Amino acid sequence: MTARKKPKVYITRKLPDAVETRMRELFDATLNIDDTPRSPEELKEAVKHADVLVPTVTDRIDSELIEAAGPQLKLIASFSNGVDNIDVAAAHARGITVTNTPNVL
């Protein structure tokens, strides 16, 4: 029997320790340990390989970034109360689900 691969999750900013610990347990997670904002170019490179993108409200997820994503990107799960920083229409056009975390802040 072959082990099932963990989804690749790219997390753009530092999250609470408990969240990052759980992410590492469940996923092949790339964390932003130093909490330095990633440039648009760095984000474009990251979404080429990610199954899930976890941005925060400070990250602009526009149509250009979404178009740079690989076909395996299926979810943008924003660690924020809203999704105003995400081009939801562009994501939906690519079959990417967009969610947020209400009451997280």
Report the location of each language-model feature:
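N-terminal glycine-/charge-rich "phosphate-binding" loop or analogous flexible N-terminal tail
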Residues: M1-V52
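Phosphate/diphosphate ligand-binding glycine-rich loop within oxidoreductases
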Residues: V52-L105
